[in-house]
């Protein structure tokens, strides 16, 4: 079991903890598939809803909040039945807009894993307005059920009445609908190709600034992040922040980053290079490789 879970595992009922420990191996990064979840429910003799709430301390253990020191864990349950953990991330000494909220982390985890819809969000603190707006960008966002400890469950539409969302800006294919934009680039570099593929899968209906970041660690492992825009603009999730959240979930340190690539569209209304460099330089003493590509 990873050291970061030693304290949180003691907060779980013993039967659930005993069943969960084998899953918390060195490669565990917060994903539990539907079959594994069913086995946890059976072994613990708890309901699924009880298990999901009980797992929140495990999700919160993924957090890296050096500024607030407030650990938030979130669990997104997909239509597939799989669950995806996420946690808040803050960059020490940097402006707060670089922060990743736990719900954003969990949703990006699900998106990068190929999930097509979120049906439940379990979180240990009431979603802030920023996260409510971010969730509203998703497929059937208003119908996502929000579950909090010691509170009744409600739909997102309860927490965000009279919501402004993608349809108000004539966007009919919201976040998590698989969409692919093709770009022209002649490269044999696997890391650049990976970034190009993820840029094509990014979500930028408001600026067409399709973009992705890939980070590489010294052992050759890569961690990606895609741009995810929001109808309200400010809650958009930048690809570098998503990549850093991804890396952190996998229990890697920022000091292990040896290479960083940003690929973005030449036809976007904005460029993410400045914000991407700011975030990168806050955590690693390396230069960003910036590649601009043309849509096919």
UniProtKB/Swiss-Prot annotation:
Active site residues per record? 103 (proton donor)
GO MF entry, a single one:
identical protein binding
The protein's annotated catalytic reaction(s) are: cytidine + H2O + H(+) = uridine + NH4(+); 2'-deoxycytidine + H2O + H(+) = 2'-deoxyuridine + NH4(+)
Signal peptide start-end = none
Which GO biological process entries does UniProt record here? cytidine deamination
CMP/dCMP-type deaminase domain location, by residue? 47-167, 186-296
* Pfam families documented for this protein: dCMP_cyt_deam_1, dCMP_cyt_deam_2
Q: Which cofactor does it need?
A: Zn(2+)
Q: Which family does it belong to?
A: Belongs to the cytidine and deoxycytidylate deaminase family.
| Alphabetical list of HAMAP family matching this protein | Cyt_deam
Q: Which NCBIfam families match?
A: PRK09027.1 (NF006537)
Q: What is this protein called?
A: Cytidine deaminase
Provenance organism: Shewanella sp. (strain ANA-3)
């Amino acid at each position: 079991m990873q050291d970061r879970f030693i304290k949180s595992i003691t907060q779980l009922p013993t039967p659930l903890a005993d069943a969960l420990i084998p899953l918390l191996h060195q490669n565990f990064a917060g994903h539990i598939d539907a079959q594994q979840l069913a086995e946890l429910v059976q072994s613990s003799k708890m309901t699924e809803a009880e298990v999901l709430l009980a797992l929140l301390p495990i999700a919160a253990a993924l957090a890296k909040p050096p500024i607030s020191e407030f650990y938030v864990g979130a669990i997104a349950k997909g239509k597939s039945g799989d669950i995806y953990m996420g946690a808040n991330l803050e960059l020490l000494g940097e402006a707060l807009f670089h922060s990743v909220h736990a719900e954003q982390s969990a949703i990006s985890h699900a998106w990068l894993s190929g999930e097509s819809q979120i049906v439940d969000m379990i979180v240990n603190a009431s979603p802030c307005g920023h996260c409510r707006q971010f969730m509203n960008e998703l497929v059937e966002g208003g119908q996502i059920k929000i579950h909090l400890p010691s509170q009744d469950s409600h739909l997102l539409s309860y927490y965000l009445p009279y919501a402004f969302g993608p349809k108000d800006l004539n966007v009919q294919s919201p976040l998590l609908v698989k969409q692919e934009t093709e770009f022209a680039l002649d490269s044999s570099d696997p890391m650049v190709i990976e970034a190009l593929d993820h840029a094509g899968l990014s979500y930028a209906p408001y600026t067409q600034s399709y973009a992705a970041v890939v980070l590489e660690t010294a052992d050759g492992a890569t961690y990606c992040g895609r741009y995810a825009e929001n109808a309200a603009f400010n809650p958009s999730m930048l690809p570098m922040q998503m990549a850093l959240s991804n890396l952190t979930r996998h229990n890697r340190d920022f000091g292990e980053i040896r290479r960083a690539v940003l690929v973005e569209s030449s036809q976007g209304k904005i460029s993410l290079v400045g914000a991407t460099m700011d975030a990168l330089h806050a955590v690693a003493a390396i230069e960003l490789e910036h590649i601009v590509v043309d849509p096919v």
